[in-house]
Amino acid sequence: MDDNKRPLYLPFAGPAILEAPLINKGSAFTEEERIFFNLEGLLPHVIETIEEQASRAYDQYKNFSNDLDKHIYLRNIQDTNETLYYRLVQNHITEMMPIIYTPTVGMACERFSKDYRRNRGLFISYANKDRIDDILNNSTRQKVKIIVVTDGERILGLGDQGIGGMGIPIGKLSLYTSCGGISPAYTLPVTLDVGTDNPHLLEDPMYMGMRSPRIGGEEYKEFVEAFMQAVNRRWPDALIQFEDFAQKNAMPLLERYKDQYCCFNDDIQGTAAVTVGSLLAACKAAKSKLSEQRITFLGAGSAGCGIAEAIVAQMVSEGISEAQARKQVFMVDRWGMLQSNMPNLLPFQQKLAQQCDDLTNWDNFSDNISLLDVVNNAKPTVLIGVSGAPGLFTEEIIKAMHSHCPRPIVFPLSNPTSRVEATPKDILHWTQGKALVATGSPFEPVVIDDTTYEIAQCNNSYIFPGIGLGVLASGAKRVSDAMLMASSRALAECSPLAIDGEGSLLPKLEDIHLVSKRIAFAVARVAIEEGHALPTTKELLTYAIEDNFWTAEYRSYKRTAF
């Protein structure tokens, strides 16, 4: 029997039920439940359906005039009645995703301490480093299967937000549920409070985190190690997603733990997977291969390099050598294009630096090759922005790219909207509507000469919920590169533009449940093939995915002995 249809036996009654967001039904408690659980008189007389509740909640939602207030309102529903919250969000997913996650969640993180209302998740401070096991045991969620953890140091494009970064794990897990069907009872947001280097927070009397500079070095490594070991003791089968760690920690933590635990870094691997999936869809629409493209990145941090490495892997899978694939990828950061003779390149940047001997025929060859120089010399067909710096895809650069590429692929992916390298409207106007555009944050459709262009949001929410569902359904013990590549290919197969020759580059968010299930199946199949999960048939795997897919419906309650 579907878990949603089984009665749930509860050992408590009265107001305590109304204070438990995973259990509370509000006005939807039946007459029998109100009697058995001592709720008579605590609720208005009328018994409502969840759709009636959602209709009222949506009317209230529309009365708020700004996005931050809407975010706070939705979070209040989440903290009082999670089933209603997810029914409401799922009914209006396209409208509400930018409110519960990017870009609005960035403002919520900045105001986290000022707007704090109710506890959610776990805050593990360095001061309590010797009591992490006890803290995990204090969690209100007992059967945790997915954890999203941050240390708040690199929140979107906003930098160090300290414990305010908790808004990101909360938002991400909301998408695991609303997009990927993961029961909210299985999710846990965690913030590692290691201090902050943000002077505004240190001086803010309302800041609720540790008011001390961030720890680093061996102290930091030992603290994260203690956390990972404690989680493995408490929930050995849980999937751990690293979120918004600073560049200096993100890649080292991923490299350290990816072969020890079931974990991944969404900023590096999730962003890479959705970008590769979007590129594969764009290439299909243009009737070409990814291995035929010349790709330029603006931004050579851990996220940009993670995307680049995933692109190289996909190119190699299409039949070209790794050396040739790397020659077709050009990384530009604040110091110019990465070159092999540059000092102080980070380990993950070194493999993506262009060999100086290959650049001697370039115009303006120097130690500092600008983005425009790269566009004019390398003649890229794909331009990807992960710089976090607004306006750097200028009209001159886009037009220079378009002059040698009839249908350029341009992905300004930086979040939030205020950090985007160029707006879709500008890119499409500068290319007379020829560019294939996807962005990291949501944008309205663009109209040029009576033609409407839907702007695909190259958002990780297309990928990570499906990965989580696939891991849960298969029981996978690791998240491998091949599993991530499978998620990219599955996403590309869902592209309306690639399939039908028209429409958006990525599926509509209204279809996200179907997309997540398709990705989950692809991810789980590879997990089984690689030995990360036990063998099963396609039919049983499909059943497991459906069985693990939670829907926002109320269960009936029965009272058990105290």
Curated annotation (Swiss-Prot):
One GO term (biological process): malate metabolic process
GO MF terms, alphabetically ordered: malate dehydrogenase (decarboxylating) (NAD+) activity; metal ion binding; NAD binding; oxaloacetate decarboxylase activity
Residues bound to a divalent metal cation: 243-244, 267
Highest taxon in the source lineage: Bacteria
Binding positions for NAD(+) per the UniProt entry: 154, 267, 415
Keyword NAD assigned: yes
Keyword Oxidoreductase: yes
Record key words, sorted: Metal-binding, NAD, Oxidoreductase
A single cellular component GO annotation: cytosol
Catalytic activity: (S)-malate + NAD(+) = pyruvate + CO2 + NADH; oxaloacetate + H(+) = pyruvate + CO2
Active site: 101, 172
One Pfam family from the record: Malic_M
Needed co-factor(s): Mg(2+); Mn(2+)
Swiss-Prot/TrEMBL site (Important for activity) positions: 267
Entries under SUPFAM superfamilies matching the protein: Aminoacid dehydrogenase-like, N-terminal domain, NAD(P)-binding Rossmann-fold domains
Cofactor note: Divalent metal cations. Prefers magnesium or manganese.
CDD domains, per database record: NAD_bind_1_malic_enz
EC number per UniProt: 1.1.1.38
Family: Belongs to the malic enzymes family.
Subunit structure: Homotetramer.
Protein name, entry field: NAD-dependent malic enzyme
Organism of provenance: Shewanella halifaxensis (strain HAW-EB4)
